A protein has these predicted regions:
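Short regulatory alpha-helical coupling segments
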Residues: 53, 67-86, 118-126, 144
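A short, aliphatic-rich beta-strand micro-motif
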Residues: 1-5
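A short pre-motif secondary-structure segment
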Residues: 130-133
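Short beta-strand-to-loop transition segments that serve as allosteric relay/switch motifs
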Residues: 7, 12-23
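Alpha-helical scaffold within the catalytic cores of cyclic-nucleotide enzymes
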Residues: 118-119, 150-167
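Short catalytic/binding micro-motifs of nucleotide second-messenger systems
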Residues: 80, 123-128, 160-171
Length: 171
């Protein structure tokens, strides 16, 4: 077998077995080593692409979809809802008096609030739903295949969870 390395760090291995007892030739082994290096390089570039994609499509602070990606995905979901004849519901959240939080408690605390609210939103919707940071302290949730009647308890639960959260922050 040969290791698969990314920057001299083992990330996997390739192991080959033969049914017959004939050993692999030196040329076979060299080819396998070369393949392991190519595979390691491919894994490295795939990880780099994933980082670039994440940076391009997600808000850096909240790790939610960014505004542009939200608009693109929203259009896709509208078309999907029309095609499959199902509902989508959009819920918009705005943090009241957020400027006052930044002005009185500082921007690090404001960042903590944004990150905490982002986590609350993600934890209170399904994996198929979309959550986005729409603007400074504005968030949008798209509930897929969900009527307004069924979305209301979700929105109320999120508002209640945010309102009751202690927001303890140690700088």
């Amino acid at each position: 077998g040969v290791p698969i390395k990314v920057h001299n760090e083992d990330v996997g291995s390739i192991i080959l077995e033969r049914i017959n007892p004939i050993p692999f030739s030196a040329e076979n082994q060299d080819s396998l080593i070369f393949f392991g290096k190519i595979l390691g390089s491919a894994i490295f570039w795939l990880k780099e692409y994933d980082k670039l994609y994440q940076d391009a499509t997600h808000d850096g602070l909240s790790q939610l979809l960014n505004h542009q990606t939200f608009k693109e995905r929203f259009q896709e979901e509208i078309l999907r809802a029309e095609r499959f004849q199902h509902f989508i519901t959009v819920i918009m959240f705005d943090l009241d008096k957020f400027k006052r939080i930044n002005d009185t408690l500082g921007h690090p605390y404001g960042d903590y609030v944004i990150q905490t609210v982002s986590n609350i939103l993600k934890e209170n919707v399904r994996a198929i739903d979309l959550v986005s940071r729409y603007g400074g302290e504005e968030f949008v949730v798209i509930l897929i295949n969900t009527s307004a009647e069924n979305a209301r308890p979700v929105g109320e639960r999120i508002v209640k969870t945010i309102a009751e959260y202690p927001f303890d922050y140690d700088s």
